[in-house]
Amino acid sequence: MHNIQASSITLGDCLGKGAFGAVYRGLNIKNGETVAVKKVKLSKMLKSDLSVIKMEIDLLKNLDHPNIVKYRGSYQTNDSLCIILEYCENGSLRSICKNFGKIPENLVALYTFQVLQGLLYLHNQGVIHRDIKGANILTTKDGTIKLADFGVATKINALEDHSVVGSPYWMAPEVIELVGATTASDIWSVGCTVIELLDGNPPYYDLDPTSALFRMVKDEHPPLPSNISSAAKSFLMQCFQKDPNLRIKTRKLLKHPWVIMNQTSSKFSDAIDEVQKYNERVKESTLTAIIEPTSNRINPTLHSGRQSSYHMPESPKTPIAESPDHDNWDNEFQGTLKISDDVLKKSEHFMDFCSNFKGKNNSSSITSSPSKSRHAFNSDQISESNNFNASPLSTPLKAQFDPSKPALNRSIDHQKTPQHKRYLSTEFKENIPDGIEKFVETPRDSEFTDIFPTSSIKVQGLRKETGLGTLVLNKCYGSWNNEENEDGEESDIFDSIETNLENLDIENNIALDKRTHLASLLSSLLGSLRDKNIGSKDTTVSQIASILSEDLSLKREIIQAHGILPLLETLREIKTPDVQLLLLKLINTVAFDDHTTLQKVCFAGGLPLMLSFSNREHSFEFRYESAIFIQQMYRTSALTLQMFLSSNGLNSLLLFIKEDYGTNRDFVFVGVEGIWKLLRQQDYIPKNDICTMVVNDSLEPLTKAMLKALATDDDSSRMSLTRICEILLALSQADNYVKESLLCESALRRILRILLYLPHSDMAITLQFFKQLSMVPSSLSLLRKVHIIPLLTHILGDSKIEKGRKEIRSEALAALFNVCKLDKKSQEEAVISGAIPLLQEVIIKDRLFKEFALPILLALPQAGPVSRIYLWQNKCLDFFLSLLSDLNWQSAVFDTIASWLQFELREVQRVLAEKRNVQLVLKVFCISQSASSNRMLDTLGRVCQISPRLAASYGQPIIFQKFKEKLTHKGTKPIVVLNIFQIMKSMCEASSQSVAYIAHCGLPDVVANLNQTSDSVLVKELAKDLLKYLKVPQGPINEHKSPISKPHMPPPRWQPKQPLTQ
């Protein structure tokens, strides 16, 4: 190893610091070269890592390309390993973005081309970068781009064991899922870096690292910047192919039009000038849009913009000459609409028919009279009355008014008057969308009287609840114009009526007259409310209430007489509490369950007035009436729900939730249901805004109501409990601000205290709430503090949970996964709580949940000595070895075993060196699929470097035969060749028998051939070292004579026959 002496390097100023150490500017006093010195603390690495890193540095010194930072060597001090690198004076592209702003697209394309050239060289040499980002792309004075922090530097940056390795915002999905890094992973990182340079930040930078990792795996591709060219979008979509096997290669990406057409080279100073000018232009255009006088675009007057339909446009100053054919538009449509003569003749015939039909109708007084009676009202009356056909209010609300008591002035305490439950109902009622209610069927639609003809006109009895008779006219399918029957005799359609008319009851006529009188009196009283000269209106309001109590259907007359506005104005004027309460009851009665009337109340300005009575300064009766109105507002239609929210109705709901559940629980029901409804209507109302307003108040009242609802055993409380759970889940699905606002220790403790007592469906919803909350990194310490981990562990092992067990275990396991994934303290607490045997059981029995359980278990060897003690107690090393047969997880499991070997070399080595385990590892490696075995090569090389004993044990003929197959395959990548050579070198150093096995398999010829023919500098260097161990001359290959004689070797005892089952 040709390392630089420490005395030849003088350190200068510090360029940057990190968890691993620091980077300094240095000077090589022997040749005067300025270098960068990366000092890595020896305390941050294991002894086994140190020798490997030194070896790799010596190997990487051979790499030389204009677009990569060159390794100069290394030296070691008492406390640090110093790595000498080429110095790039102008810093990184990340620093350019930070200091000068976004980089223009043409310059990004130029930089990307150079990045890809350097990356292609690394890939051809068998090196995966693993950490491409703007901070690792350096620039020189002449504008050259150089890739830094590849190879050894990447491993050093990841020395903080089991943290988010490298840079999570640039990580490929397969790396996040622990499948392993490949050259395709670098291509994904290139795409993320391009977005970073174009947009200033990488994808998902607004999210916390855990949420970003989740989105990278789940989303089809990261969001692309909106202001880029189509060529740039095409380039990025090639980089963001989800399947790494289908992702484009570096060589092909260099031929993409986006990087080809932007090849104008520029110096660093010119590039900085271009970046500065670009960002100045962006700022200028933004400021112009803000500072520019709005008079040229928006006229701040009442009649600005387009002409109002209520005002005539100004007449032009210059008269416009009228064209000769001013009203003739035939020429305008000539050639676009051709009407045939046949159609025109039919149209003329139809017009003649219509005129004849009208003449017959006008001449017949008998047939026209029913029509005239139906159209006696004006159009406004018809449109108003149509809203009340088959009204659902008449029957249920009739029971509220006792004729023996004064009208509407009695107490409506729900405990004294059970009838009032139909007002504040907790039963869910789905809204009818606006514009659809006219298509809703009524009971009358099922009579089919317009389909099946009858021979007579029936006069039905008067309905008591309306006081009106219903005349049902049924006619035959024959035309009304037929004046004679088949026998030629004139028929009288009213023959059958005479006998039925004799049956009319005089009482019905009296009821009809009485209703007419009451309607007239009601109209008069409403008129008197409008009269400003009347002093006291208390008596008038009482009389209106009395009339309405006599006949509830008369509320239609109030609506048709436009009585809503007088009632609201009177409510504003009158200060007498009894009359105010009576008016509130009147308005609620008229508007109950009728979205049209509710909208009229809102349009008349009544919504803020009605909401004002929900404040605590008013008595229970007033707040109760306000609650009735509020419930109708959010239940009736989407439009009224939007009106309610726009008038700060959410504040009233939050006030209701704060009420005492024991005495005023109806208010709590209204508050909970209202917020639940608002969060469900996400198509109309921004869900995140509602969540923000809810958490800005407090989470305490909601959790207290949850506790009280669980303690009360009735249907309304159970429904309210479910809705509170769903509200909490909705809040946890909002943005990070809302999630962080939910981190209230007392509230979370209250929820966890009742979690095990919730119904199973509500328990699953609440566990989803904690799962979402656990995705915020700032929540981990608090969740650990409130002891959620022992509770989740208990739920996983609770055999009493039967109904919904699968869903509950799934949510609990997902929450435990989020809490433990990146936090060692949480992992240790889970281990102490008894999670290991439960996770093992899940992995064995349930393949669906294995995706969550196994990563938790695989992280534990690096969690600390306490965790490893529990791993030994539960025989987890043997358990991991048994999992090597799973093709989907074998590389991740083998990597975990290698990590455990680094921490506890003697104990783990003893188990792995057992004959059955050695054969198992060799068997798994040799019969695994190509992609999986390639991923295992890197880990196997690490194991052989750490443990010479294991290297000697694994050096058997069967593995060398596998190596030969891979080395002689034409498509073998340089990185695979490098890994194989490193493993063979470690095996030769560990055992002379391995040298004999290598010779027996014919590998020396293969190695010598690659030494001569490979394009990779690193492959050639390793081949030379390997041939020294094999004692093979390094001259030209003699094809007719083997360089060494092959000793007679017995065939291997085991040969792979069939692949392992997954």
Curated annotation (Swiss-Prot):
<keyword id="KW-0067">ATP-binding</keyword>
<feature type="binding site">
    <location>
        <begin position="15"/>
        <end position="23"/>
    </location>
    <ligand>
        <name>ATP</name>
    </ligand>
</feature>
<comment type="function">
    <text>Protein kinase essential for cell division. Plays a key role in initiation of septum formation and cytokinesis.</text>
</comment>
<keyword id="KW-0418">Kinase</keyword>
<keyword id="KW-0723">Serine/threonine-protein kinase</keyword>
<keyword id="KW-0547">Nucleotide-binding</keyword>
<feature type="region of interest" description="Disordered">
    <location>
        <begin position="296"/>
        <end position="331"/>
    </location>
</feature>
<dbReference type="GO" id="GO:0031028">
    <property type="term" value="P:septation initiation signaling"/>
</dbReference>
<dbReference type="InterPro" id="IPR000719">
    <property type="entry name" value="Prot_kinase_dom"/>
</dbReference>
<feature type="domain" description="Protein kinase">
    <location>
        <begin position="9"/>
        <end position="259"/>
    </location>
</feature>
<feature type="region of interest" description="Disordered">
    <location>
        <begin position="1038"/>
        <end position="1062"/>
    </location>
</feature>
<dbReference type="InterPro" id="IPR011009">
    <property type="entry name" value="Kinase-like_dom_sf"/>
</dbReference>
<dbReference type="InterPro" id="IPR017441">
    <property type="entry name" value="Protein_kinase_ATP_BS"/>
</dbReference>
<dbReference type="InterPro" id="IPR016024">
    <property type="entry name" value="ARM-type_fold"/>
</dbReference>
<dbReference type="InterPro" id="IPR008271">
    <property type="entry name" value="Ser/Thr_kinase_AS"/>
</dbReference>
<dbReference type="GO" id="GO:0071958">
    <property type="term" value="C:new mitotic spindle pole body"/>
</dbReference>
<comment type="subunit">
    <text>Interacts with spg1. Seems to interact with cdc11.</text>
</comment>
<dbReference type="Pfam" id="PF00069">
    <property type="entry name" value="Pkinase"/>
</dbReference>
<dbReference type="GO" id="GO:0051301">
    <property type="term" value="P:cell division"/>
</dbReference>
<comment type="similarity">
    <text>Belongs to the protein kinase superfamily. Ser/Thr protein kinase family. CDC7 subfamily.</text>
</comment>
<feature type="region of interest" description="Disordered">
    <location>
        <begin position="361"/>
        <end position="394"/>
    </location>
</feature>
<keyword id="KW-0479">Metal-binding</keyword>
<keyword id="KW-0132">Cell division</keyword>
<keyword id="KW-0460">Magnesium</keyword>
<dbReference type="GO" id="GO:0044732">
    <property type="term" value="C:mitotic spindle pole body"/>
</dbReference>
<dbReference type="GO" id="GO:0046872">
    <property type="term" value="F:metal ion binding"/>
</dbReference>
<dbReference type="InterPro" id="IPR011989">
    <property type="entry name" value="ARM-like"/>
</dbReference>
<dbReference type="InterPro" id="IPR050629">
    <property type="entry name" value="STE20/SPS1-PAK"/>
</dbReference>
<feature type="binding site">
    <location>
        <position position="38"/>
    </location>
    <ligand>
        <name>ATP</name>
    </ligand>
</feature>
<keyword id="KW-0131">Cell cycle</keyword>
<keyword id="KW-0808">Transferase</keyword>
<dbReference type="GO" id="GO:0071957">
    <property type="term" value="C:old mitotic spindle pole body"/>
</dbReference>
<dbReference type="GO" id="GO:0106310">
    <property type="term" value="F:protein serine kinase activity"/>
</dbReference>
<protein>
    <recommendedName>
        <fullName>Cell division control protein 7</fullName>
        <ecNumber>2.7.11.1</ecNumber>
    </recommendedName>
</protein>
<dbReference type="GO" id="GO:0140281">
    <property type="term" value="P:positive regulation of mitotic division septum assembly"/>
</dbReference>
<feature type="compositionally biased region" description="Polar residues">
    <location>
        <begin position="296"/>
        <end position="310"/>
    </location>
</feature>
<dbReference type="GO" id="GO:0004674">
    <property type="term" value="F:protein serine/threonine kinase activity"/>
</dbReference>
<dbReference type="GO" id="GO:0005524">
    <property type="term" value="F:ATP binding"/>
</dbReference>
<feature type="active site" description="Proton acceptor">
    <location>
        <position position="131"/>
    </location>
</feature>
<feature type="compositionally biased region" description="Polar residues">
    <location>
        <begin position="376"/>
        <end position="394"/>
    </location>
</feature>
<dbReference type="GO" id="GO:0005737">
    <property type="term" value="C:cytoplasm"/>
</dbReference>
